[in-house]
Structures are given as C-alpha cells and as structure tokens.
C-alpha cells in the first residue's frame, strides 16, 4: 500500500513538471514571436534613372547625349581588415584603376572617421566599369567574402560592395560648336530616385526641355536576399524606363563647323566683340546654321555669363541701313513712290535740324532704286516725309518688327519700335535709315527672307522633328507661314537688292553663277550718354540662290575694332561672301552655268 502511494506521488510530480515545462515553452514562444527580432529587412526598392534625350544634327551626328555615372561604396563593417588588401586588388582588376588610385583609396581609409562606416571607394564610374564591379560584388557575396553585422537599427545585414547610380552626365561631343544656341543644363536631385539629373537652362536644351526630359524611371520592387539583391518573381514589381525624346535639328554639323571656322579667321582681323552668322532655307524657314564667335564649352562654362546668351535673339540693337528696304517697300506698297521716279538728294548734303546728313555717294538726284543701291540717307528722308507716323510704324509692324519671330529658342527679345503718337519729324527721318528702333538679328533674317520667298513670312526653325516611343513627330505645326507682300512687290525688292550687289555698295559679294542680293548697314552703338564716335555695329542681310535652292543669309559684326572695319562693306559684306563660298563648297549651292548670268567675278 505504501509502495502504491509512493508511485502515485511520483506520477503527480512528473505531471506537474511536464505542465510547468510546457508553460515555460509556451511563454517563451509567445515572447519570441511578439518581441522585436533581429532579422534582415526583406523589402527593397531599386531605381535606375531614365536618361535625357540626345540632340542630333541634320547630317545625323549626335552632338549631345547623356550617360549614367556610378560610384562604388562599401560598408567597412562587411569586410575583415585582413582581407582588405585582397579586396582592393580584385577591385583594381575589375575597375581598371591605377596604382595611384588604389593608394588614394587606402589613404582616405586611414583618414576615415571611426564612426563613419560607409566608405566611397571610387566615383565617376561609367556603365562598363559599373557592370564589371557588379559582377565582382556578386561573386564575392556568393563566396561568403563579406560578413554580416548588426546595423544601428538592430537588424542583421550583409552590405558588401555596392555600385550606385548617382548622377546623369550630359556630354557635348562637339565641344563649343553650336553654342550658344544649343544651350546647357544644370543638375537637380530627382525626388523619386535620389539620383542627380539634368534640366535645361539655356538654348535648345531649355526650349525643348519637356521633350528631352525623361518620362519614367526604371523601378524594381520586391523581396531581397541576405546579400541585398532583389529576388525577381511573380510578386516583384518592374517598371520600364522611358527616356526623353531624341531631338533632330535642321542644323548641319559640317556647315556649322565650316562657318564657325570662317568666323574665327575673319575675326582675327576684325577684332570684333562678336560676329553672328545665320543661314536659313528660304522656302521652309529651316535654319541650317546659326553661328557665333562667342562660344563656350557647355561642360566647362566660364565666369563671363554674357557669353552664355544667344545674341542672335537676345541682343537688341539699332540696325542702321539694313532697315531701309522695309521703309522703302512700305512707301512703294502704299503708292507713295514709283520705281522710275527721280528724287532730290541735294548733292549728298542735307540739313536735318541742327545736324547735317551726308551721303557717301554725293549725287544731286537719284532714282528710287538708286536710293537703296547707294544707301542714301538723304533719299530715305525724302521718302519718309511722304509717310505719316502711323504708315511708317505700321509698315515696320507688317514685317514683324516689334514682335518675337517665334524661333524655337527661349528668352527671345521682341525689340522696340516707336509709338506713332510720339514720333516727331526728326525721329521719323532717322527711323527711315535705321535709328530709333531696336531689332534683333533673327528678326532681320526672317524679315529679309520675305523678299526671297515670294512675299511669305515664315517662322525660323532650328529643330525639325523628335523621336519617341518608336516614332517620329514633325515640328512643322509650330511654323507660321503668312503672306506679307504681293509676289510682285517681293520680286521688285528682290531685284533692287540684287542691284545693290551687282551695281552698288555690295560688289565685294559678287559670286560667279550665284544670284545674290542684300543690303549693308552700319550704325553707331547707343549708350547711356548717347552715341559714341568709335563703336559701331555692321550688318549685311541678303540672299544667295541657284536654279534650285534659295538661302537667306545674315551677318552681324558687333563693334569691330580694326580701323575703318566698322563700315559694313569692310566687315559684314566679306563675311557674307565667305558664307556663299562655303555654301558652294559644301554643295548647298551650285553655280549656274549660263553665259547670260549677270553676276561676274570681282
């Protein structure tokens, strides 16, 4: 009986012990499941920045593009110190860096603050280097080269070698060519990816920024393994990268470079503040070249901010005698003058208020056509007297002076034309030969194009089309075409301008087999204290045609400092001739083989 009781007590005690054990296991399990656990974070978002589009010339040269730039980082807690020399040797082999760069990495490591674990091994890696190093990182992870550690949040992780895309590099292959019209960009932080990207600031980069800018970054979202790599499966999210558009220009690289070279050579002699040259296809408004002597490398811009401006559209100036054909045409269109009419030019000297106006060609009388041919200021004053204030100002407005041309560049200035209500007689007189108004180079180019385009005004355009989503989109919808003059009036003025070159002030531009016309213009530069005696702008605007092609050409020489070069016939006109010769050499023009051709060599 006593033995039985003893066995029973033992069984009860065992049961209580087992119950207590199960309770301890249950409580421990509950605590473990509900407590903060030191396990790796299992989710990850990974971005790749979509790139800004390229800019491509008419002759299919990519002059601007973007590329991804990476950096290599490592968390120093992921690697044993005794393995670091081996790691650096492998890093050098895969990245292709020099011994000096390896030495620099070691030196920076020695100066690294003790509490700073994240260490940048190398910056400015290209895509090829990044690809090789990503392969190295994967191999080292698989081989267990990197060790796990507990981070500041109490989580266990293995970071190892990390290759990070950190910025988009904008590359200008043509260096300073096409500047300032191509413009430049600046970097900002993309809020989604945390990567530095480019936005347009000036020129075509600014005007077409919405098109060139990337549409959608690449995004991969999903669970990650212990090495930090995203596990791609049905539950992971993949968002496709959509880059910005590729912009195709009307500008020709070969023609642009040839004209820029000619500008440089000419300016070695003229010592001008700037020379601007534009070539426009007369029938379409397409700008084939728009060059300046004030160029810069968009990737290495200097401190002179004025160089960054596109003077062709941003610089307003009094143009001088190149305005005469528009006042002349207005009077002709309104029936105020006749082409066969003879006008008094007072022997080349005329009193205007307290000033005496003198002509270079001193003649008692001139035909109306000779007023333009010999650029008579006195003749233009007589013509202006026949126009009232509203007629003369409205005539300028018809040719789009005082409004933007609509060219595809930002920050275009519209110029200034006088208020007819406040225009005094003396102001109207000087207006007739190009003083008292402000215009821009591109306004004059577009206005002269009317004479070479059957009386039609057409918007000048630098870009032709863009490519995106597998298709081209033409930009012709933004081009405005408007009949300004009758065909007869345009033809009359075209012939008048041809005579300027063949018989008048433009003889230096005569080119055998090419139909060329245009007008010189020399004007003093206005400053705060008035007009200076030694600062001038010289211009020549006109056209050059063969049997099948027609081009409108403009030249502006800003403040040439060579003695007597301020006369347009000594500066802008020879530059015009250079451009015509280039157009022939580059096969844009073919001289007419005709014994009856009126143009002859000098």
What kind of region is each of these model predictions?
Residues 1-300, 390-400, 509-512, 528-531, ...:
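Periplasmic/cell-envelope proteins involved in peptidoglycan metabolism and beta-lactam response
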Residues 62-64, 224-238, 275-321, 326-561, ...:
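Beta-lactam-recognizing serine transpeptidase/beta-lactamase-like catalytic domain environment
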